[in-house]
Regions:
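Boundary at the C-terminal end of the N-terminal hydrophobic targeting segment
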Residues: 19-21
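Beta-strand/loop nucleic-acid-binding surfaces
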Residues: 64-88
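Structural detector for short beta-strands of small beta-barrel domains
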Residues: 26-59, 101
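OB-fold/S1-family single-stranded nucleic acid-binding modules
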Residues: 53-55, 104-126
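Bacterial N-terminal signal peptides
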Residues: 5-15
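Short, surface-exposed beta-strand/loop "edge" segments at domain boundaries and coil↔beta transitions
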Residues: 57-66, 125
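Short nucleic-acid-contacting surface segments enriched for D/E, G, S/T with interspersed K/R
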Residues: 83-99
Length: 126
């Protein structure tokens, strides 16, 4: 009987996890994950350096033509247009962080490194 209880508890945990993955992310939501630095090249040869949060799958709204709604987004490109933004993120590399995604959209071009582009964000305190 104990085994059946453990199996049922496991299925419930899986269902809860799947339900959480199905919630579409919106502007103003919190993204939590590991911060990493990605270096790649644009098809025109330009070097790209991007800060990304890697997190659990998050669904994007179905109305965005650039997203694959059936597959959750796991990489979030935090735009760092200023030296201050880069300086804020650099000591957090490799760590678990949370940011408020003030603005976000599905990646549309080769300049967007990851599933979702986050042009405006705020680091949240631990």
């Amino acid at each position: 009987m104990r085994f059946v209880g453990l199996v049922v508890a496991g299925w419930i945990a899986l269902l809860i996890g799947a339900a959480q993955a199905q919630q579409p992310i919106r502007e103003g939501d919190t993204l939590t994950g590991t911060l990493r630095l990605v270096t790649t090249r644009h098809p025109n040869g330009t070097k790209l350096v991007a800060y990304q949060i890697v997190s659990e799958p998050r669904m994007m709204p179905a109305h965005d033509d650039f997203c694959d709604y059936d597959k959750g987004a796991t990489t979030f490109h935090l735009f760092t247009m200023t030296d201050a933004a880069k300086k804020q993120l650099k000591p957090l590399l490799g760590k678990q962080i949370s940011v408020k995604a003030v603005a976000l959209f599905c990646s549309e071009t080769a300049w967007h490194v990851g599933d979702v582009a986050v042009p405006q964000w705020t680091v949240l305190p631990k």
